[in-house]
């Protein structure tokens, strides 16, 4: 039987069509395929251009207050950023279109490793040029998938890009091997950059530094205390920590700390906190990711802390607990920093304009762990018990009425 690759029908529509051997690709088919490919390229390019503009508009919206006040800003990346179809390296370029962006070009200096991983040294106010402290931004990755890792410079591999582009909005925790981690290069860079800052100061000493990233490392669980499953307000751990229930360890956490959900860390520990301790100088690591958490604990000789969600377009705590975290540093002793939450409740009021939505966001559950966590909340359990009692009473009353009628 002839192969479709080498044979074609000649004379279609005539009295004597025949099968002939093709010397190459069918000219009409090739033209049709070329036309289709060109259309696809144009469509994909236009869609990406539209997406880029949407990303620009989004950046402009949340950067608005900083831009209007001419306040410099820097950004790193979380596990959902890529799901718009524009990856971190290109988002970095888009950020730099805005005045005041301090994100450096990846690999442009020893202080800039990759998109979202870089150092921002702060010099003394006396004009000496001495670095008094540094802010470190760390790209903590998105989802674990070692087979499709990037090239270590923040430039995603072709395979990874294809997977993201094919179904970027669908790629999530359920499709991966857990949450991501900083790259091995980033963990090593956290040590190396301290040596570079010490070299620039001329004394070789690590400078006081605070790090910011999205996904927390496993050591954040060390700020918690394991308790029995029936403990009120306890939360069950996630993934590798599932089956264990926790509350805040008040002995290590600052006053005002809140634990609203499980710590969503990676399944593996890549030694980031150990690297911070080994490098010296690092006094704090703050993360986001878990929308309901806003605690600060001191373990492993370093502060580990959270800021919760500040908006109302996703799940989170009650309106009054949503907000941003403010930091204040003293030049003479940056390690003695002050941090506090600026919440919606403090700045605006107890309630938002859509409390029904906030209620569902606060109580949304997606699995059995979420159900169990909700049942540990005293208000929820009391409401369910009350509703159950009323229901049982109503059923009992109805049954009693039926029995009376039957007598």
Q: How should each PLM-predicted stretch be described?
A:
Residues 1, 37, 41, 72-77, ...:
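Structural recognition of the beta-strand scaffold that forms the well-ordered cores
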Residues 2-5, 44-46, 75-87, 143-146, ...:
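Active-site environment of divalent metal-dependent phosphoester hydrolases
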Residues 9-42, 48-203:
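Extended active-site neighborhood of metal-dependent phosphoesterases/phosphodiesterases
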Residues 85-90, 148-150, 221-226, 318, ...:
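Short aromatic-enriched loop/helix-cap "lid" or pocket-rim segments at secondary-structure transitions
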Residues 119-127, 257-279, 291-378:
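Binuclear metal-dependent phosphoesterase catalytic core
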Residues 134-136, 151-288:
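His/acidic metal-ligating clusters that form di-metal
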Residues 379-403:
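Hydrophobic alpha-helical topogenic segments used for membrane insertion/localization
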Residues 406-407:
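Cytoplasmic C-terminal tails of single-pass
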